[in-house]
């Protein structure tokens, strides 16, 4: 049996921009991607804490150190600059993999600086 579980999330990221006139996606700072073990092109769920919106998109690479979190294309209609969001990725695990299951949780501050990295929910 396999089960879909949390793989990684960036918790309470601040939206730095919303660019409607761009091919759809979410731009994420390279350092945040590395810390969260997320990958360019990976499907992610976006949970908007401010308005309750939940939608999916894919990741594109943001410039290292700029702390950009930018929703692009149609997704830009679902957020406003300054909104708090959670960027979530799931993965499918089998029973054996679940014995050592440790999701990655990256906690960020209002400037999208990493405050803590957890390996638990």
Swiss-Prot record:
GO CC terms in record: cytosol
Alphabetical UniProt keywords:
Autocatalytic cleavage, Cytoplasm, Decarboxylase, Lyase, Pantothenate biosynthesis, Pyruvate, Schiff base, Zymogen
Which reaction does this chain catalyze?
L-aspartate + H(+) = beta-alanine + CO2
- SUPFAM superfamilies the UniProt entry points to: ADC-like (SSF50692)
Recorded E.C. number(s)?
A: 4.1.1.11
| Catalytic site | 25, 58
Per the entry, the cofactor note is: Binds 1 pyruvoyl group covalently per subunit.
Please name the pathway.
Answer: Cofactor biosynthesis; (R)-pantothenate biosynthesis; beta-alanine from L-aspartate: step 1/1
**Primary location:** cytoplasm
Q: Which cofactors, by name?
A: pyruvate
The UniProt entry's GO biological process terms, in alphabetical order, are:
alanine biosynthetic process; pantothenate biosynthetic process
> Record's superkingdom?
Bacteria
Q: If you read the UniProt record, what top EC class would you report for this enzyme, in one word?
A: lyase
Tell me which residues bear Pyruvic acid (Ser). 25
Q: What does this protein do?
A: Catalyzes the pyruvoyl-dependent decarboxylation of aspartate to produce beta-alanine.
Family annotation (PANTHER family): ASPARTATE 1-DECARBOXYLASE
Q: Which family does it belong to?
A: Belongs to the PanD family.
Quaternary structure and interacting proteins, as annotated:
Heterooctamer of four alpha and four beta subunits.
Task: Please state what the protein is called.
Answer: Aspartate 1-decarboxylase
